[in-house]
Amino acid sequence: MASYSGYVEHSDFYIRPQSYQDAFDFLCQLAVESDENTFYIGKVVDNGYDFDLEDEVMFVWNEDKGAWVEYD
């Protein structure tokens, strides 16, 4: 099973690897609490020392929809 991590914009740390849904939910909450409107999530790839993100996706808060939407 793949692990996922991510970060909110203007942050200098990644969240710990976890399931996609758990990472997504945590990043939504973290972004709101940090007054951010953008976060990134991706698949964790071990680099031997730490990890990198692969297939990174950006989500942006959409005021009109009242939801986080994937941004291309």
Q: Where are these predicted regions, by residue range?
A:
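A short, sequence-level motif marking secondary-structure junctions
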Residues: 1, 18-24, 58, 64-67
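Short aromatic-glycine-(Arg/Gly/Cys) micro-motifs in beta-strand/loop hairpins
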Residues: 1-12
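Generic structural motif
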Residues: 11, 20, 44-47
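Surface-exposed loop/edge segments in extracytoplasmic proteins
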Residues: 11-17, 52
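A short, charged, amphipathic alpha-helix used as a generic interaction element across diverse proteins
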Residues: 18-40
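Short, mixed-charge low-complexity intrinsically disordered segments
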Residues: 33-72
